[in-house]
Curated annotation (Swiss-Prot):
Name recorded for this polypeptide: Probable GTP-binding protein EngB
Family the entry assigns: Belongs to the TRAFAC class TrmE-Era-EngA-EngB-Septin-like GTPase superfamily. EngB GTPase family.
InterPro entries on file: G_ENGB_dom (IPR030393), GTP-bd (IPR006073), GTP-bd_ribosome_bio_YsxC (IPR019987), P-loop_NTPase (IPR027417)
Gene of this entry: engB
Natural source organism: Metamycoplasma arthritidis (strain 158L3-1) (Mycoplasma arthritidis)
Its biological purpose: Necessary for normal cell division and for the maintenance of normal septation.
Gene Ontology biological-process annotations: division septum assembly
Cofactors required: Mg(2+)
Amino acid sequence: MWKFIKSATDQNNWLEHDQNEIVFWGRSNVGKSSLINALASQKIAKTSSTPGRTRLINYFETQRKKIIVDLPGYGFASMSKKAQSKISGIIDFYFRNSKNSKNICILIDAKIGFSYIDLEMIDYLKSLGLLFDIIITKIDKANQSQKHRVKQQALTFSDDINIFMVSSEKKQGLSDLVEHFEL
């Protein structure tokens, strides 16, 4: 059984542990929390139709004792510049200073594809020397052409990244994530 462990506002209350972290990050409203709930088969992460609701670093533990980190989304439209700046600073500090090794998963909405800000965040991760995988979400809401386009975009990044296509709502592709990350 998965469980919520804690929320952290900054490095002073990060979860202290010695495990690899599986980090979910993407644009606001891309489905990070919904994906966690679908993988857990229970509602342990708060979801909202309003973008930018996750403003803390949230830690979860899988039944196999893996640590999942739900980061606040980027591209928050309904948030003040001050709040955006604070969250960006927390995330930057986390990526630069957290001692735990990380499997970073960039989540991309299948209908929207890679936006300019997604590409900026990928460049940012590369500039830090961090590796990442791509999880294409909401595939049940995209048509065949949109799914093909976003997958082709994802394939341009590198041969070493894993690409997953999932639907939290229809439970599609979840077993691939469970198997790959040993959740």
